[in-house]
Structures are given as structure tokens and as C-alpha cells.
């Protein structure tokens, strides 16, 4: 079976930066944890996991207002966040 390449360091950094933005708002953080099924401890333990990084960015792509707001807050572009999500979850290039 062909192994996936390791996530690009920029994608991982983007996911962690986005996570900081997500966790900056209690309601948004609670929604993220509820939708991903992660507990705070599980999230802390899985930050280096490609699937967790993908889940962070996929959470944003599922909520356009959050995607646009996060991109603006972290000085990025919504399309870059979406592309990183696709690469991390294996659906993109």
C-alpha cells in the first residue's frame, strides 16, 4: 500500500495557527470539540497527527464565516486554508 507523504510543514503550521484562533472563542472552541469528538486532553495529545490537523482546517471549511474570519485574523487566504485541509486529509495535491 502506498503511504501518504508527510504533511507539509506549512500546512501543519497553518492548522496550528488556525487552532489558536478557533480556541480563542469559547463557543467556537466548544463547537469544534463537539463536532470532532475530541476532548481537550485528546486534542493536546494529537496536535502532531495529520488527521487532527486536517480536522482543524476542515472544521473551518465547513463554516464559511469562520473560514473567512480566521483567514483574515491570521493574515491568510480562505483558499489557502481549504487547500491545506485537502492536502492534510489526502483529498488534495
Give the predicted meaning of each segment.
Residues 1-93:
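Metal- and O2-centered redox machinery and metal/ROS homeostasis
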Amino acid at each position: 500500500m502506498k503511504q501518504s507523504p508527510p504533511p507539509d510543514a506549512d500546512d501543519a503550521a497553518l492548522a496550528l495557527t488556525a487552532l489558536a484562533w478557533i480556541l480563542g472563542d469559547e463557543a467556537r472552541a466548544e463547537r469544534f470539540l463537539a463536532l470532532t469528538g475530541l476532548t481537550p486532553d485528546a486534542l493536546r495529545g494529537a496536535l502532531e497527527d495529520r488527521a487532527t490537523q486536517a480536522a482543524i482546517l476542515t472544521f473551518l471549511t465547513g463554516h464559511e464565516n469562520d473560514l473567512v474570519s480566521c483567514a483574515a485574523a491570521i493574515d491568510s487566504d480562505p483558499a489557502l486554508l481549504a487547500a491545506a485541509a485537502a492536502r492534510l486529509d489526502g483529498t488534495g495535491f
